[in-house]
Amino acid sequence: MFNFEISAHCPHTKGRCGCFHTPHGPVQTPRFMPVGTLATVKGISTEQLARTGAQMVLSNTYHLHLQPGEQVVAEAGGLHRFMGWDGPMLTDSGGFQVFSLGNLNKIDERGVVFRNPRDGRTIDMTPEHATNIQMALGADVAMAFDQCPPYPATENDVKDACRRTHAWLERCVNAHTRSDQALFGIVQGGCFPHLRRESARAVAAFDLPGIAIGGVSVGEPTDDMHRIVRDIGPLLPLDRPRYLMGIGTLREMAVAVANGIDLFDCVLPTRLGRHGTALVGGERWNLRNARFRNDHTPLDSSCSCLACTGHSRAYIHHLIRSDELLGLTLLSLHNITHLVRFTNAMAQAIQDGCFSEDFAPWQEDSPAHHTW
């Protein structure tokens, strides 16, 4: 039911392209996944989302547990039917949100007790509970409940988080019973190379259908993130999809693909869109800027998204300056399409044997003027 096929390798890097098969269809890799935290990508319908070329969508267990509750989603027939998306889906376990957003009362070997920010009630989140919620939601891929340490953190604190993450992973595996849902483990370890290597080996030993690298994009220097991906890549199974969590800039994705990463997710494209910013090439354009007022050309003539094929820069500028919701939707659609096109282009370059040449500039500090 779950199978990962690699169709080509880059001869000069660790980059590869392939296909991850799920019950709701294939996911061509490398691939960017839009984030639909509450069973919706903000401001975008599922029909519009499909036009971006997105194949797999991420939702969040923590937020869906709080609202509307997994029982409501299960009664609707699962997450796919609830939101009207018939493609592959992944649910994050909510571990990151529990530790970053929740008002923690207690964390111990059993799990986490935190206060619901909506109504103040106490929630006891254990690995078993997080797994049961995700089984009720019914996405194609569920993520193991993990402890994501903040940055910076002491070595002892990160070591404790790794120990809990590995122990909790075993409990998630034992609790997970849906054969039509894959469970991915998550590598932690902060910016400590030896802890990252230990975690990679520990998680890989569970022989799960896929593996993720967590605890990045939490404030650490970019070079540290690149080193983490480079160092632990050789320790991960070659025949399983590798998912780098929370990453969505062009440079970071190019570096990650060169080191054998297959899947990415990030709120960046929609967050930028909601603030009037468009991704064009390697640049970020603020469409509120007066220079777009009389510019009647498409946002990006090479892009086939709804914003670029039907509207001008001047019109989108007008929408943003007028605080019209359509402007935010158009920019969000464009930005998602932009990242999907970028990962598609990397896959094609790997197939054609020119990835290391064509995408080397994107791994530099300032790739703004490069195209693909």
Curated annotation (Swiss-Prot):
Alphabetical list of Gene3D superfamilies matching this protein: Queuine tRNA-ribosyltransferase-like (3.20.20.105)
Parts of the chain that traverse the membrane: none
Cofactor(s) listed in the protein's UniProt record: Zn(2+)
SUPFAM superfamilies documented for this protein: tRNA-guanine transglycosylase
Binding positions (Zn(2+)): C303, C305, C308, H334
Cofactor note (record): Binds 1 zinc ion per subunit.
Keywords on record: Glycosyltransferase, Metal-binding, Queuosine biosynthesis, Transferase, tRNA processing, Zinc
InterPro entries membership: ArchSynthase1/Queuine_TRR, TGT, TGT-like_sf, tRNA_ribo_trans-like
The keyword rRNA processing appears for this protein: no
One Pfam family it belongs to: TGT
Domain of life according to the entry: Bacteria
GO MF, any single term: tRNA-guanosine(34) queuine transglycosylase activity
Record family assignment: Belongs to the queuine tRNA-ribosyltransferase family.
UniProt-listed NCBIfam families: Q_tRNA_tgt, tgt_general
Entry protein name: Queuine tRNA-ribosyltransferase
Annotated source species: Synechococcus sp. (strain CC9902)
Record lineage: Bacteria, Bacillati, Cyanobacteriota, Cyanophyceae, Synechococcales
Encoding gene per record: tgt
